[in-house]
Regions:
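A structural micro-motif recognizing beta-strand termini
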Residues: 17-20
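C-terminal structural segments of small proteins and small subunits
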Residues: 44-74
Length: 74
């Protein structure tokens, strides 16, 4: 399942981050790495962007990025 499929207040453990290059590095720099727990806080009305909580920080990411983050639902 991808992070983009989680509903608000659902959490998932990152299994892997797909993609390559600058986009993947950016996600890693944001603390989104394997075995990290991510919680979806809320979604914009049309589903993009998604507000998430990672390592105690709240941030927004695009749905396109969220769909590259493979998670295991917690």
């Amino acid at each position: 399942m991808t992070l983009g499929n989680l509903k608000p207040n659902q959490s998932g453990k990152v299994v892997r981050v797909e993609g390559q290059g600058a986009n993947k590095k950016r996600l890693f720099d944001m603390g989104i790495t394997p075995n990290t727990i991510i919680k979806v806080k809320k979604r914009a009305p049309l589903g993009d962007p998604i507000e998430i909580e990672v390592r105690g920080y709240v941030m927004g990411i695009r749905k396109e990025e969220a769909n590259k983050i493979i998670v295991e639902v917690q």
